[in-house]
Regions:
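Active-site beta->alpha loop and helix N-cap motifs at the rims of alpha/beta catalytic domains
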Residues: 33, 43, 48-161, 179-183
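N-terminal amphipathic alpha-helix/helix-capping segment at the start of soluble metabolic enzymes
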Residues: 1-18, 66-71
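Glycine-rich phosphate-binding active-site loops on the catalytic face of alpha/beta enzymes
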Residues: 117, 177, 224-243
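C-terminal helical cap(s) of enzyme catalytic domains, especially alpha/beta-barrels
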Residues: 237-262
Length: 580
């Protein structure tokens, strides 16, 4: 009897791996019936990740979007699954336990069947509450392994994580090969070991196509006993995204597996609608580089979906690096040469930083340190001269236990800066918070919604939810679309003139610089020219990878100029504020 291979369509991750935004509710409800008609999917990845947050950025209600989008799949008996980041929930930074618990209750009520939970560090302690809360809510708990390739990420290492999450009660295991750098034979051996030790556990494989190995990995894990394979479809398959259903279907069929038939008429309809969504406005936010594959990623292990933001960061520092090289009578570097240097620097520092799996947000942390190291080195400084607070939290153990040891240089640096390593449970650092958010809703006269779903959204994405309720988010999004339309009609915008400063820093003036490539959104309640500020005050917000990051004053002073305006794209190293 042939072994059956089942497919899951990654309709959410197809978009998230391609660009900034997801389809809106009316687009999703238009395409859903045709996905059902394809007749070949047992599962659909519908939400989680950045899905809910993106709806808020539109100025739309994510709860309405999730409920309406899931209805056709629930009615057809197709299982729906979401992605959540354990300690970080469905945002990019840690979430209190009571908010995490409410998330599973809300998502089950909205129609989500399966919670795929991963910890970017593979720390089983972060996964424990995800498994328990999912099961308490009546969901299927699928614990995901963050797959990467290093001397410490062996089959035995991953089996150690599997043993713990099965002990916690996980129903299924996912191999989350987020960068597509898992080696096919090793992944096959891992699945073989899981199936031998836990024959009743469902195994699902998720791989990105960027480096070019994921189809081979799919064949290996299928032969080893995997049950489900995650796939994408045109026009968003391949590139830095995922292998296409049609190719994977053909490979599995040729290998002797039983696979469902594809209704190609429905496939073409879904393909056509997806292209319409791209042509409508979503294509404005798809980085063309994400449509290309490159095996250069294998050495660094960076996920392909980072290429767009990484190239933006490189452009932000390229001129400064060449200026420093020129001042030393050294040859300037091309963009391609700088990319290769960055990849090599990632390879160099990744072991020193304890081999964190290069998945969001830890991939950004390692990439940022590598980039700032390059800036430091060309200016005659040492590596690790600039490490941001989030990266320090990872290095010190506040996000979980690193897979490998830190290099002595980093241990010594932490000691010199008076930083303490943390060995407790990361969740203990984040006390319950729902009561405070519940009071905020009462004070504003906002309903908590069915199953307290509105309360959950405020607690999970507080700033974005407030912007949605005030109407600011909708106005911001419409302006963004208008700007994109204008750019397209006029061609590429002219390069912005350098920002003019009132005075030179040599005359008692200090500047605060951006530490990342981001988009600036002002908050007039926080900062105005003439304000007196103290070191540590919140001055403004930058939006980086769909997350708002606070910009703090690094000194006492008076605001002389705000050097950026609403919606500006800020490069790493750009001046933001002028102080006296």
């Amino acid at each position: 009897m042939k072994k059956k291979i089942r497919f899951s369509l990654l309709y959410r991750d197809m978009w998230q791996s391609s660009g900034k935004y997801q389809p809106r509710a009316e687009q999703l409800t238009a395409v859903a019936p045709h996905i059902v008609e394809m007749g070949c999917f047992d599962r659909i990845e519908t939400n989680g990740g950045a899905f809910e947050q993106v709806q808020l950025l539109y100025g739309e209600n994510p709860n309405t979007a999730v409920r309406e989008w899931l209805k056709p799949f629930n009615s057809a008996g197709i299982q729906t699954h979401m992605l959540e980041r354990s300690l970080n929930g469905i945002r990019m930074y840690p979430v209190p336990a009571d908010v995490r618990k409410l998330m599973f209750k809300v998502k089950k009520a909205q129609g989500v069947d399966i919670a795929r939970s991963f910890c970017g560090l593979n720390d089983h302690r972060n996964l424990e509450l995800s498994v328990k809360y999912a099961r308490e809510a009546g969901m299927i708990s699928q614990a995901a392994l963050s797959i990467t390739h290093s001397p410490v990420h062996t089959v035995d290492y991953f089996m150690g994580v599997v043993d713990r999450v099965v002990e916690y009660g996980a129903d299924e295991i996912c191999l989350k090969d987020m960068a597509g750098v898992g080696r096919p034979a090793s992944l096959g051996e891992l699945v073989r070991r899981i199936k031998k030790k836990y024959p009743g556990i469902i195994v699902q494989y998720h791989g990105h196509s960027g480096p070019g190995m994921s189809v081979a990995s799919m064949l290996e894990v299928a032969r080893a006993g995997a049950d489900y394979l995650d796939v994408a479809m045109e026009p968003l398959s391949w590139g830095m995204v995922h292998p296409d259903l049609i190719a994977v279907h053909a490979v599995m069929q040729d290998a002797g597996f039983e696979v469902p038939e594809i209704n190609m008429d429905a496939y073409m309809k879904v393909r056509s609608l997806t292209q319409e969504f791209i042509d409508d406005f979503l294509g404005y936010f798809i980085d063309p580089r994400n449509r290309q594959m490159t095996s250069l990623l294998i050495g660094s292990g960076l996920p392909g979906g980072m290429m767009g933001s990484m190239m933006a960061d490189l452009k932000g520092v390229h001129q400064g690096i060449n200026a420093a090289l020129k001042a030393k009578n050294k040859p300037e570097m091309t963009e391609d040469e700088l990319v290769v240097w960055l990849f090599r620097e990632v390879e160099h520092i990744w072991p020193m930083m304890g081999y964190p799996p290069l998945v969001t947000p830890f991939s950004q942390y390692v990439k940022n340190v590598a980039l700032m190291n390059i800036v430091s080195l060309v200016n005659g400084k040492e590596r690790f001269a600039m490490i941001d607070p989030n990266t320090w939290d990872m290095l010190l153990g506040r996000a979980g236990k690193l897979p490998g040891p830190l290099a002595p240089e980093l241990v010594e640096l932490a000691a010199r800066e008076g930083k303490e390593f943390y060995e407790g449970n990361p969740q203990d650092n984040y006390p319950d918070a729902l009561d405070g958010y519940r009071k905020e809703m009462e004070d504003n006269g906002w309903p908590v919604g069915p199953d307290e779903e509105e309360l959950f959204e405020l607690a999970m994405h507080d700033r974005q939810y407030r912007d949605y309720k005030s109407g600011v988010a909708k106005k911001r999004f419409l302006k963004e679309i208008d700007d994109k339309h204008a750019e397209q009609s006029k061609g590429a915008p002219a390069k912005a003139a350098p920002r003019k400063l009132l005075n030179s820093p040599d005359h008692g003036i200090a500047l605060l610089y951006s530490g990342a490539t981001a988009t600036f959104w002002p908050d007039e309640e926080l900062l105005n020219v003439g304000d007196e500020v103290k070191k540590g005050d919140i001055l403004m917000y930058l939006m980086i990878d769909k997350r708002y990051r606070e910009v703090l004053a690094d000194r006492d002073g008076t605001v002389r100029q705000i050097l950026v305006k609403s919606g500006d794209r800020i490069s790493k190293g750009d001046p933001l504020i002028e102080f006296s």
